[in-house]
Amino acid sequence: MARKSATKPVKARAKNARQAETRDDAKQHTRAALVNAALELFAEQGLDTPSLDAICDRAGFTRGAFYVHFKTREDILVAVMDQVGESFLAGVFAQMPDLAGGGRRLHHAVKRFVDSVASGAYPLMATGGKGPLVRPHQLLDACARSPVVRERYRDLVQLSVGAVAGLVKSDQDEGAVRGDVDPETVATMALALVIGAQTMNDLGLAMDPARLASGIERLLATSEKREKS
């Protein structure tokens, strides 16, 4: 009898754990649906137009469900920024340390970025008639209004600067990038170029990202690498 009764608490704990896991899964599903709905509406209508009711209707949930996960409209915008920004950066910088030697890490990252612009995958630039996921000027307007949104955008930019600086330093160590330039300065310059290119693109000014990238790479290359290219 003692053995039989001892199994009851174990079964109860297992059942409670399964129920908790199911509830957590449901919460994650709801949150993901709300974020994806906001992303779709921001892409279709801009950052300012979609209401919370519209986001909830698109996701198939109530305002009550929204407030379980987000306190304000700013919060869901930040969640969208996290999802889009972190996913994009992971695609550009993933597995760079695992590449073979030869000082090609920066080149590969630049190529991935240029390819993403050409394919329309970069969320802040229009390509070939396909509008950007988010208009850069709307994002900057949101940053001007909201310290929370501004801080998250700054974080993503600084994360990018750090990643690029790491690639520059690795390539310098392998003799592919000039050693007389500071990696963080180069990375900051690269991000300033990207943000400037976003503005030019938003204004409808023509430019060739691949040519810009090639020019920057030549400026950074050692004399030996330039002679070979």
Which role does the model predict for each range below?
Residues 1-45, 49-61, 75:
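Basic, helix-initiating cap at the start of DNA-binding domains
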Residues 4, 126-129, 148-154, 158, ...:
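Hydrophobic/aromatic-rich alpha-helical bundle segments in the mid-to-C-terminal region
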Residues 27, 31, 35, 81, ...:
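Amphipathic, non-transmembrane alpha-helical scaffold segments
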Residues 44-47, 68, 178:
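Helix-turn-helix/winged-helix DNA-binding modules
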Residues 59-70:
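Short hydrophobic/aromatic patch on the recognition helix
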Residues 70, 77-84:
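Alpha-helical DNA-contacting segments of helix-turn-helix folds
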Residues 79, 93-131, 183, 187-190, ...:
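Hydrophobic alpha-helical connector segments
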Residues 114-165:
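Short secondary-structure transition hinges
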